[in-house]
From Swiss-Prot:
Residues 1-26 form the signal peptide. Belongs to the peptidase S33 family. It comes from the Bacteria. One of its GO terms (molecular function) is hydrolase activity. The gene is yuaR. The active site is at residues 207, 433, 460. Pfam families: Abhydrolase_1. The keyword Oxidoreductase does not apply. Keywords: Hydrolase, Plasmid, Signal. Its EC number is 3.4.-.-. This is Putative hydrolase YuaR. The keyword Membrane does not apply. Residues 94-393 form the AB hydrolase-1 domain.
Amino acid sequence: MRVIMKPLRRTLVFFIFSVFLCGTVSARQIEWQSCMTSPYSDWFGKESSSPELLCGYLSVPLKYTDTGKDVSDENIPLVRLAMTKLPAKSKRKGSVIIISGGPGLPGINPYINFDWPVTNLRESWDIIGFDPRGVGQSFPAINCQQSNQERLVNVSEKQLILQKINACIHNTGAEVIRHIGSHEAVYDIERIRQALGDKQLTAVAYSYGTQIAALYAERFPSSIRSIVFDGVVDIDDLNDNFSWKLRQAHSYQETFDRFAAWCARTKSCPLSSDRNQAIHQFHQLLLKLHNSPLTDSRGESISSDDLISLTTELLLWRSSWPTLATAVRQFSQGIVSNEIETALNSSIASEKVSDALGVILCVDQSDEQLSQEQRKSRKKALADAFPAVNFEREQSDLPEFCELWPIHRDLQQTRLKNTVLPSGLLFVAHKYDPTTPWINARKMADKFSAPLLTINGDGHTLALAGTNLCVDEAVVRHLLFPGKSEDITCQGSGTGDTN
C-alpha cells in the first residue's frame, strides 16, 4: 500500500545481518517444516498462526539478467525468501500465492478468512505466503538502523535524511539494495511458481502487490492461470511519480470529505458536513496539537504528526472510521483514552516496515533532480490536493527522501511491453479507495481486457477477508474457474451514506 508518510514517533529496535549467501539455485526446492519448530517459531512474533502452517526458505539469485536468467556464475550471491504453506485439505490441485502490499509488508501470515466460500478454495489448493526480498524474515533484510553514536546532533533536516540513507546502504549493502526492487520481485514470483511445481501461476495480489503481479503479467503472459488484483496500482503511471502521488492525494481528500459528512450526520465527532468548514475545524485541531501536544499514559507526546498518521491510516477502512471519530472528538477535548492510545500504537508502522517501504520505492524510481521552484510547486500542488492534513501554509523546499537517494533502477527501463495479453485476470477495487483510486483498476482492466469487480463503498482491499460475501464469492469463483468472470458490482460499506 502506498501511504502518505509522516515521521514515526516510536522506534522498533532490531538487528539483521547484512550479508548474503553464495551458491547455486538449480535445485529450486523448499524444505517444508512445521512452523512450530525452530527456527521458524519466532517468525510470527505475537501473531498467531495455524498449527497446520508449514515454513521454509527458497533461495533465489540476488541478481537476474534482464531476461530473468541467473547471472552466469556458479558461486552467485543468493537471497533467501521466507515461505509459508497452508496445505490443501484434500487432493491438491495447485497453489494460490498471496502477494502482499507495502512495499515492505511481510506476507508469511496472510490474513484470510476461511469461512465459506473461501473454504472451497482451501479444499484443493495450497495457500502460499512469503516475505518479499529485503522484507521480514527473508534474508538479507533492509536495515536502516542507526546507533546513538551514529546519530548526529544539531544538524539540518537534509543532513538527517542523508544520515538515514547512509545507514540504509551501509547496513544492508549497496549491492543488495541495487537488486531489491520490483524488477527482481517479478522474477522471484516466477521462481516461487517453479519451486511449487505449478505449471501456471494462481495468485491474489493486494495493493503494491498488484504492481508486481501486473508486471509479471506483462513479462510472463502464458504462465498465468488466474490472478486477482485487489487495490490496484496503475503500472503505466510508474514513470511519473508525481502524477500518482497527486491522484492519491485527491482520493484521500475525497475520503476525508466522506468521513466528515458521516461524522456530522452520526454526531460522532465535531466536524461539519460542509467541506470547507470541516477542513478548517481539522486545521484548528492540528494547530492545537502542533503548539500544545497531548501526553499519553506513558508520558509520550501526541502531536499533529501523530493525528495525521492516524488519519491517513484509519481513513482506509470504513470499519475504522468510528475509532478515528473518537480520536478527533477526544483530542478536541484534550483527552486520550486507552482505546486511542492502542490505536496510535498499532497504527504506527514499525521502523522496519517503514524503512523497507522507502528503500524499495526509491530504488524503483528514476533519478529525478528538481529545482527549488519545481520542488515547491509540486509540494504546493500536493498540499492543495489533500488540504485537510496540510495546515502549515509555508511549503518547505527540502528535498524528499527519494530525491536524495543515490541508487536507482528505473522500473520503466526494465519493463517488457509484451503484445500478448494474458487471460485469467480479475481486478477488484473500492469505488472510494483513498490510496489506490478506483480509476487505477478501471485503466488496468481496460489495458489487459479483463473484468472489473467494483465494490460500491469506502475501503482498501477486501478479497478473501470474510467481510463481504459478494466479493468473496466472485473472487473464489474466479480462482477456481478462471476466464468466466464478467464485470460485477458488489455493495460495500458506506453505500448511500454520503454524496
